[in-house]
Amino acid sequence: MPKIILNEKQVDSPEDDNLMSFLQARNIAVDNLILEFNGQILTGKDPLGTILLKDGDTLNLFSMVGGG
């Protein structure tokens, strides 16, 4: 079972899991998030369902905040 680093915490991921299903299983909506996956910036517009997770992958989530 791959171990993923999610916001600096180690979590398990099912074998052959993709990034979108990983997030959905944790009830994480990507609409207003910026994702840093292995040092690369992604958004909900990227094809997250095609990114397969591997042991040691790193994912950091940042929420968009607006204001004035």
Model feature map: region roles:
Residues 1-67:
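Ubiquitin-like/PB1-type beta-grasp interaction modules and other compact soluble beta-rich domains
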